[in-house]
Regions:
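Phosphate/NTP-binding elements of NTP-utilizing enzymes
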Residues: 1-227
Length: 227
């Protein structure tokens, strides 16, 4: 049993939304709706309270899009090529402690997050804050590795300008201009099905960003899922 539990730590997405996890996808309706919506909309926002697996769900989707490993029940966006994407949080520290942690695992325990250990080809340290990664390369079945670029909102627009991405994940509410610039990074890959996801707990109520997301949802092809 101990050997199984130790091996299970490195099983990536297989740790989640399964019978063995205690939370099979059949009882996680809103999470399933969130995943499914990525196949129909270019922007999908998952509004949820704290401790409701919104960040876990964001990391799960990113793992699928970078490794090409999809569960049988997956009804969301699929890519059939190596992908490049932005994974961003509010600050360098929060990106390290949430987004990076969910994808890679704790510092010193990389491979225990959503990206399976055997799929991690390279992690490039950023320097500051300590333990933060600049990017990681992920093995898939298409040849060239996928690339995850770790960014933060406090880096301003220069951090993401000029990039061409297949997907983007914003964890928590971004500054509106940062969000627009990230979305613009998806235009060159639109024909491949590029998609942006935003996982957020609306601690400050209906801010201008959240209201504008609702207002433009029909125009931009967006969806909101709330838990």
């Amino acid at each position: 049993a101990e050997e199984y539990l130790n091996r299970r730590k490195y099983m990536g997405t297989s740790k989640w939304f399964t019978e063995e996890s205690g939370f099979p996808i059949e009882v996680c309706g809103k999470q399933k709706e969130f995943f499914d919506a990525t196949s129909r909309y270019r922007q999908v926002q998952f509004r949820a309270s704290n401790r409701s697996s919104k960040t876990v769900s964001g990391a799960y989707a990113v793992s699928c899009w970078t490794t090409g490993i999809y569960p049988d029940w997956w009804g969301g966006r699929k890519f059939d090529c190596p992908t490049t994407g932005i994974a961003a949080g509010q600050t360098g520290q929060t990106t390290r402690d949430t987004v990076q942690k969910e994808l890679l695992g704790d510092l010193g325990k990389f491979g225990t997050g959503m990206i399976p250990k055997e799929r991690i080809l390279k992690v490039q340290p950023k320097g500051q804050p300590p333990g933060a990664m600049d990017y990681m390369l992920v093995a898939n079945d298409w040849g060239e590795p996928s690339k995850i670029l770790f960014k933060s909102y406090d880096q301003k627009l220069v951090a993401v300008s000029g990039l061409a991405c297949h997907w983007a994940w914003e964890d928590e509410e971004p500054p509106y201009l940062f969000h627009n610039e990230v979305f613009a990074r998806l235009t060159t890959t639109e024909q491949l099905g590029s998609v942006l996801i935003n996982t957020v707990t609306p601690l400050n109520g209906l801010t201008p960003f959240l209201l504008n997301f609702e207002k433009q949802s029909d125009l931009l092809g967006s969806a909101i899922r709330t838990v």
